[in-house]
């Protein structure tokens, strides 16, 4: 019998708030095997019975599992590829790695250290409203596409280890260059950096994520971004979607595109595992521009992703922007 209690969640209801991790397990897993492992995981977590495993062509599976509402966990299988889709109210990015470990029966660990005892920004809500009125965050020049439903995705691999600071710096440079080439301003580039608090042994899965938010990054050098990232407080203005976020309670629908950030960046760190290869992480597309940049390192390679709303971006345009980010890492 499930002791499931749905977590409180105040996130933008226009999106599904699902975080995704795809990988290629070392041992080929059938949909039936994955379903059985998921059933056991749901029982362990006290979650309701899981939905059926989604199967089909890889891109279609990714799109489908990204749009399921409220269900804690949805899994997809396409050939050798396994896709984990979790509702962010129940699971954070590091939790996706725990799920992969449970499904494969092999340990999956990350170098990510979390936010530690970093202080919170007590003036977050007031400061964010002032920002909306006086200096809203920069947008990203949109492509001309045929609008579609749901989200669009792009991924590519780069050699070596990529640090979060380097990724933020490269993303800012790519956005500024894109906007400049299209005659758009890039004043007040704001990056929300996702972070987490690693679980202690025996803890159930939960959303332990936090946000660190940096502004006016178009004015900062790489070393200055590194310093700012180390010193910045935790963002308390409700950007994570948790029900306790003050802005989420009264301004989210009217001001979502201005309350958010130019880009969300979330790095799962260097992952160590023999369970699977090519781990690929897609953070949520919430607030601001609706663009999120994900990263995860494994076996000397870092997979970068971009995710955006298909009403504004398609895979090709996201891929072009992601290539610009990757080029600025070298």
Positions of PLM-derived features:
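Helical lid/core segments from catalytic subdomains that handle acyl or acyl-like groups
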Residues: 204-271
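Non-catalytic N-terminal regions of enzymes
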Residues: 1-124, 155, 161-213, 276-330
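Internal metal/ion-chelating core segments
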Residues: 114-161
């Amino acid at each position: 019998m499930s002791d499931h209690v749905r977590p409180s969640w105040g996130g933008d209801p226009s999106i599904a708030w699902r975080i995704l991790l795809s990988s290629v397990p070392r041992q080929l897993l059938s949909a039936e095997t994955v379903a059985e492992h998921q059933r056991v995981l749901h029982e362990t977590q006290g979650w309701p019975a899981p939905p059926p495993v989604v199967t089909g062509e890889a891109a279609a599976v990714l799109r489908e599992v990204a749009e399921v509402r409220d269900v804690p966990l949805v899994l997809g299988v396409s050939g050798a590829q396994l896709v984990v889709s979790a509702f962010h109210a129940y699971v954070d990015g590091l939790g996706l790695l725990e799920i992969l470990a449970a499904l494969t029966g092999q340990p999956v660990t990350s170098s990510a250290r979390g936010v530690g005892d970093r202080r919170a920004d007590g003036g977050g809500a007031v400061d964010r409203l002032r920002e909306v009125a006086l200096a809203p965050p920069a947008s990203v020049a949109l492509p001309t596409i045929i609008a579609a439903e749901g989200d669009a995705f792009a991924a590519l691999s780069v050699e070596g280890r990529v640090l979060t600071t380097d990724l933020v710096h490269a993303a800012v440079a790519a956005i500024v260059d894109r906007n400049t080439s299209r005659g758009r301003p890039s004043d007040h580039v704001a990056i929300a950096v996702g972070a987490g608090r690693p679980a202690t042994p025996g803890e159930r899965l939960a959303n332990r994520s936090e946000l660190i938010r940096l502004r006016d990054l178009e004015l900062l050098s790489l070393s200055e971004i590194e310093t700012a990232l180390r010193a910045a407080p935790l963002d308390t203005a409700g950007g994570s979607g948790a029900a306790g976020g003050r802005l989420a309670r009264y301004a989210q629908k009217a001001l979502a595109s201005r309350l958010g950030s130019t880009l969300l960046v979330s790095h799962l760190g260097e992952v160590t595992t023999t369970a699977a290869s090519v781990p690929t992480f897609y953070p949520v597309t919430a607030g601001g521009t609706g663009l999120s940049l994900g990263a995860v390192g494994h076996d000397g390679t870092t997979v970068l992703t971009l995710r955006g709303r298909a009403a504004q971006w398609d895979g090709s345009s996201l891929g072009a922007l992601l290539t610009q980010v990757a080029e600025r890492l070298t």
